[in-house]
């Protein structure tokens, strides 16, 4: 369910449903992946990470439940960022496909443009990614 904590399974809007979460480790993604799979419609998943996380394991967790989703790979503006092209390569090795975006905002705007009213958009992977999105939306 939706929590009262900013950035934790936080609902950003409806039609399409938009949710973000700051989960950023394999354990968190084990839970998140099944939560995302339970969202309605086609899933549009925007992810970005910092470079010190076990992204290979996280991508495998995502793929367990969400291999049919549309992915938008990005990176936070932090100096610790995992570049989006590296994330794209890691994701492909886990069987996930999508496109890369230079910024979180660009990825979010593209997902909004492509998602239907009955679809769901998820944004996560790092506190930085969610923070940048919330700042751009002025939440």
Name each region found by the language model.
Residues 1-70:
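Nucleotide phosphate-binding/pyrophosphate-handling subdomain across enzymes
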Residues 17, 59-120:
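C-terminal helical cap/extension that packs against the catalytic core
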Residues 126:
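Active-site-proximal loop/hinge segments that shape catalytic or ion-binding/gating pockets
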